[in-house]
């Protein structure tokens, strides 16, 4: 019986201790919630405050980081604001229009159906003029050709190139003024080989005529008599 009483007493004491400790903890938590967490830096009883004080260098560094972050965020905001929002904000309205964006109907320049044809004719005419210039440069720089090379140089350079140009064009209609231009130019072109042959034949005729004039008639008659006597001896 005594043992049981002693055990009941011990259990009561332990229960009372546990309840007191729980009450103490609850009161402490309520105080911390109402008064706030105590900052050791402002505690007067604590003598060592150096552990809780931040140095000036750390404060300056912290301020620098804050300033750089703020500047970076501001820069990002400006870039996002400056980015185009669709086609209407892609370019400033005060900028000059590009060539491909100019509408001729808005500017009062009506495009007729004949303009592309005229443009192609101008291109062909420019190509022909360029070929003729090249041919004239070759004629000026080339040495006169002899009679043996006549077959290679009879065809002018410009006509071979115009033929290639006609092949490139294919089935496209060649304007009439280009054909007329070729006919007129063909009459004025001097063939390389024919020009050299005419010079050689003219020079040969002049030389033979000059020799005939300079020959002595007495010498010719004596030469004929000698040839006749030689034939009689045979």
Swiss-Prot record:
Residues 223-234 have a biased composition (Basic and acidic residues). This is Orofacial cleft 1 candidate gene 1 protein homolog. Pfam families: OFCC1. PANTHER family: OROFACIAL CLEFT 1 CANDIDATE GENE 1 PROTEIN. Residues 1-21, 201-234 are annotated as: Disordered. Residues 202-213 have a biased composition (Basic residues).
